[in-house]
Each structure stands twice: as C-alpha cells, then as structure tokens.
C-alpha cells in the first residue's frame, strides 16, 4: 500500500512558502508571529535558498 506522505520540495514550497503566506492577511499574521518569536526560519521557502528551485 502506498503511504500518504510523498515528499516533494515543490509542493512543500508552494503550499507553505513565504509568497503564499504573504498573499493572505492570516498568512502575514503567521510570519509576524514567527518574527516576534525570533524563529530562525520564517517559512519553508526562506531557508531553502535557491537550491530548491
């Protein structure tokens, strides 16, 4: 039987990436909350660099 989690960096970036977060009001709230908390990475795509493209 095939497992449910089939990892893909493209899907990961498109669903939880910085651009998607910034596109909605609640997404911006998440980014701001993570900034305030002092998170090392704000979103999935921010710590990927250009290697994931």
From Swiss-Prot:
- GO biological process terms held by the UniProt record: translation
Any one GO CC term of the record: ribonucleoprotein complex
Question: Which cysteine pairs make disulfide bonds?
Answer: none
Q: Which residues form the signal peptide?
A: none
Instruction: State the UniProt keywords alphabetically.
Output: Ribonucleoprotein, Ribosomal protein
Superkingdom of this entry's organism? Bacteria
**Where are stretches of biased composition, namely Basic residues?**
1-19
InterPro entries associated with the record: Ribosomal_bL34, Ribosomal_bL34_CS
Q: Which Gene3D superfamilies match?
A: 1.10.287.3980
A Gene Ontology molecular function term for this protein is: structural constituent of ribosome
Extract the ranges annotated as region (Disordered).
1-20
List the HAMAP family: Ribosomal_bL34
PANTHER family (alphabetical):
LARGE RIBOSOMAL SUBUNIT PROTEIN BL34M (PTHR14503:SF4), MITOCHONDRIAL RIBOSOMAL PROTEIN 34 FAMILY MEMBER (PTHR14503)
Into which family does the record put it?
Belongs to the bacterial ribosomal protein bL34 family.
Q: What is this protein called?
A: Large ribosomal subunit protein bL34
Q: Which organism is it from?
A: Chlorobium phaeovibrioides (strain DSM 265 / 1930) (Prosthecochloris vibrioformis (strain DSM 265))
- Gene behind the chain: rpmH
């Amino acid at each position: 039987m095939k497992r449910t989690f089939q990892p893909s960096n493209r899907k990961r970036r498109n669903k939880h990436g910085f651009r998607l977060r910034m596109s909605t009001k609640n997404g911006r709230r998440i980014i701001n909350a993570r900034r305030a908390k002092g998170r090392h990475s704000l979103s999935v795509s921010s710590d990927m660099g250009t290697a994931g493209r």
